[in-house]
Amino acid sequence: MRKQRLLNDIQKILTLNLSIAASFWGLNTQAFAHGGKAEMVSLYQNMSEQGAKVVKDDFTNTYMITKGSMVVRAKPNSDQVLINGKPFKLSVPLLVKDGKPVIGKDFFNEVFQSGLDQTFKIENTFHPLNSLNSDEIKKTFDAINHSKYAYKNMRFAELKLKEPEKAKVWDYFINHKEYTDARIASFILLKGNQAIEGEVNLNTQQVTKWNVLKNTHGMVLLDNFEAVQRVIETSKEYQEALRKRGITDVKKVIATPLTVGYFGGKDGLDKQLNILKVVAYLDVGDGNYWAHPIENLVAVVDLDKEKIIKIEEGAIIPVPMANRPYMSNKPVPNKLKPLTITEPEGKNFSITGQTIHWGNWCLHVALDSRVGLQLSTVTYKDKGVKRKVMYEGNLGGMVVPYGDPDIGWYFKSYLDSGEYGMGTLTSSILPGTDAPENAVLLDAVIADYKGQPQVIPNAIAVFERYAGPEYKHHEIFGNQDASEARRELVIRWISTVGNYDYMFDWVFAQNGVIGINAGATGIEAVKGVKSRTMHDSTAKEDTKYGTLIDHNIVGTTHQHIYNFRLDMDVDGENNSFMHMDPVVKANDKGGVRTSTMQIDSKVITNEQNAAEKFDPSTIRLLTNFNKENKLGNPVSYQLIPFAGGTHPVAKGANFSKDEWLFKRLNFMDKQIWVTQYNPDERYPEGKYSNRSTHDTGLGQFIGNNENIENKDLVVWMTTGTTHVARAEEWPIMPTEWVNTLIKPWNFFDNTPTLNLGEDEQNTQHDHH
């Protein structure tokens, strides 16, 4: 203790001396630079104005300043700073005056225009898949607003780039052919129980398509959140239901707008009405209203009339009132010593427009308002040749079905992307916690529900990481060691849908493997119950459909089922789907062995036979029989829907076959689907999934049972977890991951990481 006090006293003396020195040099907010006085300004204020973030590390007395891919570390009274780990000399040092850091007024220009950041390159030609920019979104809205179709209060479920012709995009990207087609904006408007699909030619700024779809329910939009809150706050009937539960201040009630599903009319709801159900929570001031559910009270809200048309009630359950904040309530949080990632020579990747180059990989990234992060024109440069791997890859759709039949739960089967728009709900990524400090954070522009551009800061993170040894071999007799470190490039996107936060990582390895990882975190949707412990007489019934994770709170058992749409083009567009099964066969060659291991292979020829459960013992390949490696093997990529995770795997939907959910969403029960490419088939749950009465997605896509042999194919991989709640996930849930892989299979001639170097060097100069 004495030693610690002594160290603390020494630290105070040093800090005082530094402050005195800084005050001397910072007199009248000026310091000397090149023999003259320099004007000094506040570090925090100036950097904030420039869009940079400042964090002080008290342990090392260092200021870390970040903007984009630039990381600057500066110590008080030193004219030497580190920019991305590389030394740089300032004309004026950072000083401390009256306990506050100050810098020369030219600090930002001096540091951030130092030329040490080579991450971003100028895009010489515009990639055809580049997202609509702010100006194009405004032009689209203006074209609609000035057309004969315009009406007041237009509400947009979607406004984005119409997919250009695939063959022309590949020609641009692979063959460097000029792309001259006009850019077209497509949009979806919602008007009552109608959806309006349209297009605008951005060259002519004319509406070229206007198609009204009747009896069609679209997504839940942001103004719906506001509308249901207004409705419950003005409903006397709802307030009376609250009073029965001891709640007198409706302003403390938080409404959540939930889609109602479809149950063949058995729920008594009119299919034609534009409605949502409202389940509410009580704000008790602890910052976590999710911990205070108002159980067994559901309001059915007519969105067009903005009124409650029905209140569904069950037995009164007291609202759990114990404070359960999920923000740290410690006065001083546990402080770990800094873990610093430096890249002293800059990034190993570069970004040209929306195209990322890393080693032999090249790919385009965008943010879609519905499905979020979208990768396209994914290629791998092998021996100087840019080889196609995937035209487009993204989350196709997902569903979160709950297994509780009670009044406030039976309808909960959220189609997060199809009903709420996960791209619209993108969560800005925080450096140092959501992604490493060395990550490059990219903003994205999408259209909001009013048809206006919305900038989402830090929407996508891109970073490189060490991922263990790529390979290792040591010769026992001799001094030879073969060892190579594995590097991965991670592209991360996060979406917050109500209580849950979903993280999606696309992970590229130098050896050609692509991982797609989905992580669930945030706060569990919980049910209020009477039981405090499992020893209570009510506990058995209260936990019939979940786990008691706190006093009076049950985490209800549910699933997170993800489907990824992968438009694979393995070394070209014409691919086939095949199985390879390792089998035991009798030894017919003689000798002491009675059995052998051999491989049975077969090609799956149609879409319906390709829809199947995942058996990890079967090797599933997307194969290009028109291309071979040097040994004569056809080139392939292996498809692995479940490659590990931290929650129990969802082998399929945990529902009986007579459930309406099964009739509407076939995709959730099988893990592999392969269809012929069709640009209009984009969502496994169907384009308009809200209140759908039957499967308008993958179940419909394979209805014509097209041939899939040597065709342009799309793979739909379903994966997910069955979430059985546990106390360690409350009040906030550690991120739980499920992993998928697509993996080269005889795609290369040998170990691809032995061929690094020349190809990677050439790739650095290829910014098309």
Regions found by a protein language model. Give the residues of each.
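N-terminal secretory signal peptides that target proteins for export/translocation
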Residues: M1-D9
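Primary recognition of N-terminal secretory signal peptides and signal-anchoring hydrophobic helices
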Residues: K12, N17, W25-T125
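N-terminal, post-signal-peptide region of Sec/Tat-exported proteins
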Residues: E49-N84, K148-A185
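Extended intrinsically disordered, low-complexity coil regions enriched in Ser, Thr, Gly, Ala
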Residues: K53-T60, V72-L82, G115-I122, Y151-K152, ...
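Short, non-transmembrane alpha-helical segments in secretory-pathway proteins
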Residues: P128-F173, L221-G265
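Extended effector regions of multi-domain proteins
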Residues: K139, L202-V220, R243-R245, D283-L373, ...
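Exposed beta-strand-loop-beta-strand "reactive/processing" segments of non-cytosolic proteins
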Residues: Y151-N203, D249-L303, G359, I491
